[in-house]
Curated annotation (Swiss-Prot):
It comes from Xenopus laevis. Expressed in differentiating progenitors in the developing central nervous system (CNS). Belongs to the vexin family. Keywords: Cell membrane, Membrane, Neurogenesis, Nucleus. Disruption phenotype: Morpholino knockdown of the protein causes inhibition of primary neurogenesis. This is Vexin.
């Protein structure tokens, strides 16, 4: 069972996960508990401003930028990973000093699990908040209502060549509703 601890500070959330010790069975049939516990630490930033998360970057945690809207969550690309890459290069150089025949291995960066099950990657989310007005962490709406797509529901302003959406729906309903008739084959002669 994995435990998830969360701490909040303004618009940042610290998340750390810890998996409990595992129970192993030896060859003799005795059960022994392994004293290994795995701990991941991470930080979630609720908006796209990277300068607000500088306090957590100085610590040894991985930083995730996450956009929340209702119950959905989008993970954004990590922008500042220089400390993690430098620490991975140092570990690789130490390993290559010990064994000079083997090539240095690059360590892959792991990300902590997100706290929502509806996790989606969003590579096309804009990095600057210029087009959206942020209301807390959960809601985002366009600044200009003209930017939203509109579809006319009535045909007052549209020429008669193009039927409106309601007319299309009405035409489809009229086409599908037909009287087939009823027959009872039990009383007919063969």
């Amino acid at each position: 069972m994995i435990k998830l601890h969360r701490q909040s500070y303004k618009n940042l959330q610290n998340i750390s996960t810890a998996s409990p010790s595992r129970v192993c069975k030896s060859a003799r049939g005795k059960t022994s508990t392994a004293q290994k516990s795995h701990v991941n630490k991470g930080a979630l930033s609720c908006d796209v401003h990277p300068h607000q998360a500088q306090e957590l970057v100085s610590q040894q945690v991985e930083l995730l930028h996450v956009l929340h809207r209702n119950d959905e969550m989008w993970r954004l690309a990590v922008q500042d990973t220089t400390k993690h890459i430098q620490s991975a290069e140092k570990k690789a150089s130490r390993f290559s000093r010990r064994k000079q025949t083997a090539p240095p291995k690059t360590k892959s960066l792991r990300t902590p699990p997100a706290c929502s099950t509806d996790k989606q990657n969003a590579p096309t989310v804009p990095a600057s908040p210029s087009s959206y007005e942020t209301l807390g962490c959960r809601e985002q709406r366009p600044e200009n209502p003209k930017d939203e797509a509109t579809l006319p529901l009535t045909a007052h302003n549209i020429p008669k060549k193009a039927p409106s959406l309601l007319e299309k729906i009405g035409l489809k309903l009229k086409r599908t509703v037909e009287y087939i008739g009823a027959s009872n084959c039990a009383f007919e002669d063969d």
